[in-house]
């Protein structure tokens, strides 16, 4: 099974978390993409998708995620069969909009037929927990067997 990690960032933290997750899944078939450069046609129901998304401004999606979600809104693709997990980044100082970027991402993908699996992670910048470290730990809890992924990486499907 292929794993696709998509990140949407404003200041680069989501990218660092996405790269840390890919490192943690070393040996698996993992590809990391900036959402701003990802083509919706490449959303593959056979792959497992990890969405790493920060929150910007008043609870908005970050600039780096806007093109991806604008394309989703415009094209309305059928995402039935697409499995995804979400790692959100935010700051609890912004109580009412804390981690809203990840929540928006999950809602949009689910509304189009995608299935969110695993715990929705919500990193809080107001804590001492480093986002990349939390991402590494969280990715190990996702409902796929990395040993199985390693064995199938590189095989024709």
State each model region's role.
Residues 1-4:
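Extreme N-terminal starter segment of soluble prokaryotic enzymes
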């Amino acid at each position: 099974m292929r794993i696709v990690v998509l990140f949407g960032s404003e200041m680069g933290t989501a990218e660092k978390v996405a790269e840390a997750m890919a490192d943690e899944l070393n040996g698996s078939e993992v590809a990391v993409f900036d959402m701003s450069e990802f083509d919706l046609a490449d959303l593959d129901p056979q792959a497992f998708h990890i969405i790493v998304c920060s929150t910007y401004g008043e609870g908005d999606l970050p600039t780096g995620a806007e093109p991806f979600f604008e394309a989703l809104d415009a094209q309305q693709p059928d995402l039935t069969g697409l499995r995804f997990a979400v790692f959100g980044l935010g700051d609890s100082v912004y109580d009412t909009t804390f981690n809203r970027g990840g929540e928006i991402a999950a809602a949009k993908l689910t509304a189009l037929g995608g299935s969110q699996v695993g715990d929705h992670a919500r990193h809080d910048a107001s804590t001492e927990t480093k986002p990349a470290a939390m991402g590494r730990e969280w990715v190990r809890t996702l409902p796929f067997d990395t040993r199985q992924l390693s064995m199938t990486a590189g095989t024709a499907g």
